Structure formats: structure tokens, C-alpha cells
Swiss-Prot record:
PANTHER family: NUCLEOTIDE KINASE. PROSITE patterns: ADENYLATE_KINASE. Its EC number is 2.7.4.3. It comes from Streptomyces avermitilis (strain ATCC 31267 / DSM 46492 / JCM 5070 / NBRC 14893 / NCIMB 12804 / NRRL 8165 / MA-4680). It is found in: Cytoplasm. Residues 30-59 are annotated as: NMP. Keywords: ATP-binding, Cytoplasm, Kinase, Nucleotide biosynthesis, Nucleotide-binding, Transferase. This is Adenylate kinase. One of its GO terms (biological process) is AMP salvage. GO terms for cellular component: cytoplasm. Pathway: Purine metabolism; AMP biosynthesis via salvage pathway; AMP from ADP: step 1/1. ATP binds at G10, A11, G12, K13, G14, T15, R127, V137, F138, G200.
Amino acid sequence: MRIVLVGPPGAGKGTQAAFLAKNLGIPHISTGDLFRANISQQTELGKLAKSYMDEGNLVPDEVTIAMAKDRMEQPDAVNGFLLDGFPRNVKQAEALDEMLKSEGMKLDAVLDLEVPEDEVVKRIAGRRICRNDSAHVFHVSYKPPKQEGVCDVCGGELYQRDDDSEETVRRRLEVYHTQTEPIIDYYRAQGLVVTISALGPVEEVTQRAMDALKREDASK
């Protein structure tokens, strides 16, 4: 299957993408990973992207599209892929359609992970990170430390990142709605959008997504 994954920050896209890709036997293609790989390998596209990023500018659509195209042409993506973070706008969505059409292919589904806005804020704003090791992550509601403000693993101080403040999260949600809702509308007009609730345990959400994708696949 060829799938695009969308959902607000805090919806668990990265986690679900990894599980779904494994269950479906297709590669998980994340734009974040693509940028990091191209920059670390110093590819021409990576150098170009880095030049924009170093100046604090957004990487142009053309560069992102070229990176995605290059990755989707790899042998492991011949029979399908799960895109996470691409397309980010309608221009990129149109480019993806053209890309696939030129190869005689098309998308099978756009999986929309739905989470109420207040839950997104709760999920992200409740995160606490250890100052000694950022891999030690806690949550005031879902995974509280034994002692408030202290890491269970190493005793380091737990803090809230600036990016995780409620004000920042709500701003990120505004950007998401502005950028992504037009993409969802674009794909909905093609009958590709499959919306599921991303509330509940990770395994339940994965199963919900798998069931929805199977139904979508069977209906074609």
C-alpha cells in the first residue's frame, strides 16, 4: 500500500508509523529522517537543504519533493511506503500525485489520526525531560516520576522544554490547521481520507488503523 499519514503534533504519528510500516511490510519514510540522512551524507540535496536551514529559512518545496522522490525510487519502496511529514502542503501533494502518476501508480489511502486539541495540549505540555539525559522522558499524568521533578533513572532534574509549553503547542496547532487541513480537503475530494481516533493505548490505535486500512483496501 501507498499511504500518507497525517495528524496534529502529539498524535503519535512517529510511533504509529513505525508499527504500521512493520505490520504492512513497507518502509516508513519520514521527512525528518530524509533531511538528516541527506545532510549527514552530504548529498547535493542535503547541502542545498542545509544552506537554507543555516540561514534560518524554510527549505523550498522543490528540494523536499526531490528528496522524497529519490527515496520513493529506492527498491524497498517499489511495492509501497508510508509517508510521514510529506506532503506538507497542497503544492507538495500535487507533486506527489504527478510523481506517482508518471510511474503508473497512485496513493491508496491518507490516514488521518484524530486527537482533540485539548488532549494534544495535555500530551505535549505534560512532558518532562531529564536535564542529564534527554532519553529519560516522563509525563505529569501518564508517566509521572516517583518524586516530582526528579528523574527516576539518574536523579537528574526534570524540566519542560520551551517547545512543550501550552502557548507554543497551541501555536503549532494553528500552523498545523493552516497547512494541513487544505491537504486533507485535497485528498478527501479524491476519496482517499481514512480518519481514525488516535486516543487510547498505542496497540489499540495501531489495530484501529490496520482495520481501517484493510477496509479501505478491500473497497477498491
